[in-house]
């Protein structure tokens, strides 16, 4: 359903995955302010790209395979204040990698598919958006390694299990995790999501630390209200904050 933010509007009626707290959290958390060229992998309705456009002066390239989602995405781009900085390409990231200039993006954002060989969704569109069948972690990391500049960063959000699986594959792609945030939906509950900040390995990779800083974030307090930390992150976007 259509969703209005403070500076832009999202129509996601044709998109397999609607606007979600995961997407808003990632778009608000990713360190984008100094970025010049941003890549949004699996753009969906364009939420992350639009948040990135609001938070930076970067040129943003959005990749979306599904034609219906791409229609929503392009419409949302056209109606935004930043349409001249937003470019949508309707293709897979695998196809994009065959023609794109290597190491040309200083930030990559992605809210990846996160069901791996699990039960398929009732909606075919939703299934494509949520399953790793169309984009495995190996393919995602291959793309990040190929397209990210040497000093660049990639920001992702995944369920805990998926995040741990992805972290185990970083080394083989010459990538490393600089920071992770464990996200709990409600105070007192176990974290169920993880934000990851990934960078290329330095030349002295063998001497790099194998651990990374981990912090915690709670979305809602026990009384059901948004936490102060979440409000601080998202207040530039949500109308009622």
Curated annotation (Swiss-Prot):
Enzyme class, first EC level, given as a word: transferase
A Gene Ontology term for the protein's cellular component: cytoplasm
UniProt keyword annotation of tRNA processing present: yes
Keywords annotated in UniProt: Cytoplasm, Methyltransferase, S-adenosyl-L-methionine, Transferase, tRNA processing
Entry EC number(s): 2.1.1.223
Catalytic activities: adenosine(37) in tRNA1(Val) + S-adenosyl-L-methionine = N(6)-methyladenosine(37) in tRNA1(Val) + S-adenosyl-L-homocysteine + H(+)
Main localization category: cytoplasm
Listed transmembrane segments: none
UniProt entry tagged with the keyword S-adenosyl-L-methionine: yes
Subcellular locations according to the entry: Cytoplasm
Molecular function (Gene Ontology), one example: tRNA (adenine-N6)-methyltransferase activity
Record-given protein name: tRNA1(Val) (adenine(37)-N6)-methyltransferase
Species for this entry: Shewanella piezotolerans (strain WP3 / JCM 13877)
């Amino acid at each position: 359903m259509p969703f209005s933010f403070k500076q832009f509007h999202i129509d996601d009626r044709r998109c397999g995955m609607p606007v979600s707290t995961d997407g808003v959290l990632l778009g608000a958390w990713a360190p984008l302010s100094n970025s010049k060229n941003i890549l949004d992998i699996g753009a969906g309705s364009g939420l992350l790209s639009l948040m990135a456009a609001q938070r930076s002066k970067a040129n943003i390239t959005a990749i979306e395979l599904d034609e219906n989602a791409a229609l929503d995405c392009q419409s949302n781009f056209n109606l935004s204040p930043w349409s001249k900085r937003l470019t949508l390409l309707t293709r897979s990231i695998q196809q994009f990698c065959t023609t794109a200039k290597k190491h040309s993006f200083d930030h990559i954002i992605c809210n990846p598919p996160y069901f791996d060989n699990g039960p398929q969704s009732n909606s075919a569109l939703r299934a494509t958006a949520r399953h790793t069948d169309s984009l495995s972690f190996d393919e995602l990391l291959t793309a990040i390694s190929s397209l990210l500049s040497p000093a660049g960063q990639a920001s992702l959000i995944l369920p805990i299990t998926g995040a741990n699986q992805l972290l185990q594959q970083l080394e083989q792609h010459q990538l490393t995790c600089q920071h992770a945030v464990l996200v709990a939906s409600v105070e007192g509950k176990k974290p169920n999501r993880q934000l990851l900040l990934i960078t290329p390995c330095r030349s002295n990779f063998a001497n790099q630390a194998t651990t990374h800083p981990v912090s915690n974030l709670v979305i809602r307090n026990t009384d059901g209200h948004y936490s102060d930390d979440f409000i601080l992150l998202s207040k530039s976007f949500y109308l009622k904050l």
